Amino acid sequence: MPAPSYSTRAAAHPSPVARKLLALMDEKKSNLCASVDVTTTAELLALVEKLAPYICMVKTHIDIVSDFSYEGTVVPLVALAKKHRFLLFEDRKFADIGNTVKHQYAGGVYQIARWADITNAHGVTGAGIVAGLKQAAEETTSEPRGLLMLAELSSKGAIAHGKYTEETVEIAKTDKEFVFGFIAQGDMGGREEGFDWVVMTPGVGLDDTGDALGQQYRTVDTVVQTGTDVIIVGRGLFGKGRHPAVEGERYRKAGWDAYTKRVSP
């Protein structure tokens, strides 16, 4: 039996952010998230502009931008997201108690809850992290916000698997409107209980198998066939000798072709 399409899932999903994302993916024919780990605002905005037509989402590590300012970095980034129709995912990986993450998410210099449609968290401190982040989002903005839980990682020797992953899924189940999916390596189940998890997978490459710092790459086709909804690609799009627009379309097409295969009868 073929998997349900993004548009079918968008119509019924309990999370406003997931509905928006799945509909946008269907509209742009893209399940590609660009991971833009660059260290200046100029590089960030230029790279996003080149990749924008091919992606459904941009994933940032905003704290590595050395010349960050809200007005100079975030405001133009949000404008690009609106203009080119993609969501913003700040890969913050929150991992503290609820009261602390509430301040980290809403406050400080980055004010993540104000602008990032999506963020993520580890389950190591328990379900309080979900409640704290949701409260911060509700107190900060009327725009929909969504959380991904880190269930599995793509790096060599990662300890996020087995029992840890199972417990993280249980934490995710505590709020299906706010927690809409996982960073994971494939399908996370839950359909028989009424959950429709959106799975996003890093460590996806068409050419490389890994790097010297422990990253392990899997092919686009492999991850999509095992249940991944969004492929997260970084250096494959803009590494040395690569042209972002060319690679953006290449990965977009590979991701969409793999998805089409998955939903075809």
UniProtKB/Swiss-Prot annotation:
What are its E.C. numbers? 4.1.1.23
Broad enzyme group: lyase
Keyword terms: Decarboxylase, Lyase, Pyrimidine biosynthesis
The UniProt entry's GO biological process terms, in alphabetical order, are:
'de novo' pyrimidine nucleobase biosynthetic process; 'de novo' UMP biosynthetic process
The protein's matches in Gene3D superfamilies, at most eight in alphabetical order, are given as: Aldolase class I
Where, by residue number, does substrate bind? 37, 59-61, 91-100, 217, 235
One of the record's GO cellular component terms: cytosol
Pfam name, any one:
OMPdecase
- Which positions form S-S bridges? none
Pathway per its UniProt entry is: Pyrimidine metabolism; UMP biosynthesis via de novo pathway; UMP from orotate: step 2/2
Q: So what does this thing catalyse? A: orotidine 5'-phosphate + H(+) = UMP + CO2
Tell me the domain of life.
Eukaryota
List of catalytic residues: K93 (proton donor)
Q: Which GO terms describe its molecular function?
A: orotidine-5'-phosphate decarboxylase activity
What PANTHER family has UniProt attached to this entry?
OROTIDINE 5'-PHOSPHATE DECARBOXYLASE (PTHR32119:SF2)
Family statement: Belongs to the OMP decarboxylase family.
What protein am I looking at?
Orotidine 5'-phosphate decarboxylase
